[in-house]
């Protein structure tokens, strides 16, 4: 049976059961639906057909409605635990941005030959970004662009100083429309802190997986393990053919790309016996399709250090802890302050990380151990300070909460007092916390 028909069949089954005169389900159906969320017939009928379920549609819904819809679809997919992934994209495009705004673009299987032509590539830090949503969304496109710009500014800081450039120069495609839209907020303002920021050089690679996930069917049915293994093998090949150190690689994944990044890191370890230095998940997604008897998803142990930023736990994101340390801006919720829909909420993790990458902003997001925003507020934000973003300490563990601004600059850079324990403790969520915490 086509796996994508499972959701429709389950929906019909649930509608028929709910339509019984006594309003109760027989034991077999009742058992089959556990632990899914109960839905009325009208709610099930309101769920759009897969062909109509697009990122644009989610962007046109308010945050609460979009989060509710995604929760319903996810729970339906988990009823029988038999929605198997079947999509492994081919011809994934990769690009390497240049300081002048140009890009080197090639399919994944051709990029290594292009990299060999770049002088000194891989001698310093290499950051690999795996996108998880299509760039057809302006929200997604902008967040990814901000992250790339931030790294280009960070890696070319010394060159900027030598040529007298300031922070007003962004590295991006030099079209009129993009120039018109660039630097619309204070997160990119050049400050005195930049003058004192540490100099660092490196290279950035963007694996644009998200552009292959242009339908919900592809997104939901993505085979995370096989796609990640493909990227992991590519990283091994790159390290070997370019004779570059593997311990300078930082792998970053957005949304479902976070899980693919984790799988890629696992494949790298399987093939080499070594772990990558760091994997960062930017709002890791819920996983709809899962292979039986296989643990899937970003997790601690995928690299020497795994960190995750969760900005739409009850929307596009997942409530499942994904790293050695998990950060929850404004606590676990459907979204974060200033995000009007689930797509914007999901991409805020990328915006926050991008802000921390910019020279001088490395410690703009101080956080403290807590398992809810309520607990954070009860302690007035006091606790052992840790920093979310590029400067996160690699020996950090546990759950961390922080508050963020609704608009850029998002980081509050608020003080936090010391406590005896350095590590946060993984605790159960406070299920009584309501949605007001993220408004």
Swiss-Prot record:
The keyword Chaperone does not apply. The keyword Flavoprotein does not apply. InterPro entries: AB_hydrolase_fold, Lipase, TAG_lipase. It is found in: Secreted; Vesicle. Tyrosine sulfation occurs in the female only and plays an essential functional role. GO terms for biological process: lipid catabolic process; sex differentiation. SUPFAM superfamilies: alpha/beta-Hydrolases. Residues 1-20 form the signal peptide. Residues 158-196, 407-439 are annotated as: Disordered. GO terms for cellular component: extracellular region; extracellular space; vesicle. The modification Phosphoserine is found at residues 175, 185-186, 191, 435. It comes from the Eukaryota. The modification Phosphotyrosine is found at residues 171, 190. Residues 158-175, 416-433 have a biased composition (Polar residues). Disruption phenotype: Viable, even in combination with null mutations in Yp2 and Yp3. Expressed in females only. Induction: By beta-ecdysone; in males. Keywords: Phosphoprotein, Secreted, Signal, Sulfation. It holds the Pfam family Lipase. One of its GO terms (molecular function) is serine hydrolase activity. Belongs to the AB hydrolase superfamily. Lipase family. This is Vitellogenin-1. The lineage of its organism: Eukaryota, Metazoa, Ecdysozoa, Arthropoda, Hexapoda. The gene is Yp1.
């Amino acid at each position: 049976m086509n796996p994508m028909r499972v959701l429709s069949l389950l929906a019909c089954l649930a509608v028929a059961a709910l339509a019984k005169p006594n309003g109760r389900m027989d034991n077999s159906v009742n058992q089959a639906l556990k632990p899914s969320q109960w839905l009325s017939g009208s709610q099930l009928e309101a769920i759009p057909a897969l062909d109509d379920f697009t990122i644009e549609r989610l962007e046109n819904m308010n945050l609460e409605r979009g989060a509710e819809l995604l929760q319903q679809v996810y729970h339906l997919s988990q009823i029988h635990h038999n929605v198997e992934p079947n999509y492994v994209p081919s011809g994934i495009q990769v690009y390497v941005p240049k300081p002048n705004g140009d890009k080197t673009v090639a399919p994944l299987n051709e990029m290594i030959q292009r990299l060999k032509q770049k002088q000194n590539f891989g001698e310093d830090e290499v950051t690999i970004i795996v996108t998880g949503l299509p760039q057809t969304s302006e929200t997604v496109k902008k967040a990814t662009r901000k992250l790339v710009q931030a790294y280009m500014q960070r890696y070319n800081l010394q060159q900027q100083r030598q040529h007298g450039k300031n922070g007003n120069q962004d590295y991006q495609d030099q079209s009129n429309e993009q120039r018109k839209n660039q630097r619309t907020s204070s997160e990119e303002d050049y400050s005195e802190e930049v003058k004192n920021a540490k100099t660092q050089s490196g290279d950035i690679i963007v694996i644009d997986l998200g552009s292959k996930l242009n339908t919900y069917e592809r997104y939901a049915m993505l085979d995370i393990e096989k796609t990640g293994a493909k990227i992991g093998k590519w990283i091994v090949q790159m390290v070997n053919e370019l004779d570059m150190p593997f311990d300078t690689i930082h792998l970053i994944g957005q949304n479902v790309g976070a899980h693919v990044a984790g799988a890629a890191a696992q494949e790298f370890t399987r093939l080499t016996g070594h772990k990558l230095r760091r994997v960062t998940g930017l709002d890791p997604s819920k996983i709809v399709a899962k292979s039986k008897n296989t643990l899937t998803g970003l997790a601690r142990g995928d690299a020497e250090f795994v960190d995750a930023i969760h900005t739409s736990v009850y929307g596009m994101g997942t409530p499942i802890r994904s790293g050695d340390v998990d950060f929850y801006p404004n606590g676990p919720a459907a979204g974060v302050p200033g995000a009007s829909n689930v797509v914007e909420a999901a991409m805020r993790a990328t915006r926050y990380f991008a802000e921390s990458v910019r020279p001088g902003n490395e410690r703009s997001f101080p956080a403290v151990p807590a398992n809810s925003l309520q607990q954070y507020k009860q302690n007035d934000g006091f606790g052992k300070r840790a920093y979310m973003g590029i400067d996160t300490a690699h020996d950090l563990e546990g759950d961390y909460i922080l508050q963020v601004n609704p608009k850029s600059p998002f980081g509050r850079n608020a003080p936090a007092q010391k406590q005896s324990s350095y590590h946060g403790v993984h605790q159960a969520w406070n299920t009584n916390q309501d949605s007001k915490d993220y408004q």
